[in-house]
A protein has these predicted regions:
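Rossmann-like NAD(P) dinucleotide-binding subdomain of oxidoreductase/dehydrogenase enzymes
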Residues: 93-231
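Amphipathic, non-transmembrane alpha-helical secondary structure
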Residues: 7, 33, 74, 124, ...
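Structural signal for hydrophobic packing residues in well-ordered secondary-structure cores
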Residues: 21, 36-39, 43, 54, ...
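ALDH superfamily catalytic-core signature
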Residues: 195-287
Length: 287
């Protein structure tokens, strides 16, 4: 994406936010409902894009990428009025007899950077929060899942004006720094690796931009000698194979009691065959 286009996208959103149009309850609700309707209308295209990019089975793709967003939007619509209400807080003695309240206010223009492992859900879910909070947003989808990025841009450009929400496509190593270093976003939401998260935090510090970093890590699992081994094997294999193991909380390694080691390994092998057959790479249920 050209720097001129990025500059225009950021500055137009700053102007639109400063107009105050995004702050009202009615505006936020309307945008959330519009987003939900657009996802529903493009559901099949989204599922097709996820299959082309990652071979995601439709059921797995719906549950992990689309259904979660419906729940998030419904939750926001149900609670938004309560979230926007001023909250009474205690008043310091030195300013008595006054009273004190906290008035929730939108931050401004936010940047949302999504990963490739859940390319739809982990970009749109944070957008739901940004819209509910009354912000404008620029979305940066992963360039590793181009079909999904294209359907996201199609949906967003069809339902939202460019000065409210837009999509910035391109190589992450080029577009990301261009966005973060040159423009003073009011918040950055990033999902990805710790190494890239550190770089984003360092770049954002130039503008004192607060960041939310959802990062990956190691996820050990412990199996005691008195555990139900069959159930444990099924749960662990499901968790490890879901989305081909590309989930931040997917179990990375097991700590098992030595007395059950061989039996448990055999059970896990049998469970893989039960779930995906002798050759998982040919299974339509494997991402």
């Amino acid at each position: 994406m050209e720097e001129k286009i990025i500059k225009e996208a950021f500055e137009s959103k700053r102007q639109f936010f400063d107009s105050g149009n995004t702050k009202s309850y009615e505006f936020r609700v309307a945008q959330l409902k519009t987003l939900r309707k657009a996802i529903e209308e493009n559901e099949n295209e989204i599922l097709d894009a996820l299959y082309k990019d990652m071979h995601k089975p439709k059921f797995e793709a719906f549950t992990s990428e689309i259904g979660i967003i419906y729940d998030e939007i419904d939750f926001a619509l149900k609670n938004l009025k309560k979230w926007m209400k001023p909250k009474k807080v205690s008043t310091p003695l030195v300013v008595h007899p006054s009273t004190s309240k906290i008035h929730p206010e939108p931050l401004g223009v936010v940047l949302i950077i999504g990963p490739w492992n859940y390319p739809f859900q982990l970009l749109i879910n944070p957008l739901v929060g940004a819209i509910a909070a009354g912000n404008c947003a620029i979305l940066k989808p992963s360039d590793n899942t181009r079909n999904t990025a294209q359907i996201i841009e199609k949906i967003i450009s069809n339902i939202f004006p460019q000065n409210y929400v837009s999509v910035a496509q391109g190589p992450g190593a080029m577009v990301g720094p261009m966005l973060i270093e040159k423009y003073a976003f009011n918040h950055i939401f990033f999902t990805g690796s710790p190494n890239v998260g550190k770089q984003i935090m360092a770049m954002a510090s130039k503008h004192l931009t607060p960041v939310t970093l959802e990062l990956g890590g190691k996820s050990p699992a412990i199996v005691h000698s008195d555990a139900n081994l069959k159930v444990s094997a099924q749960r662990l294999i499901w968790a490890k194979l879901f989305n081909a193991g590309q989930t931040c909380v997917s179990p990375d390694y097991l700590l098992v009691h030595e007395s059950i080691k061989d039996v448990f390994i055999d059970l896990m092998r049998k469970t893989v065959v039960q779930f995906l057959g002798n050759d998982p790479s040919t299974s339509e249920n494997f991402t």
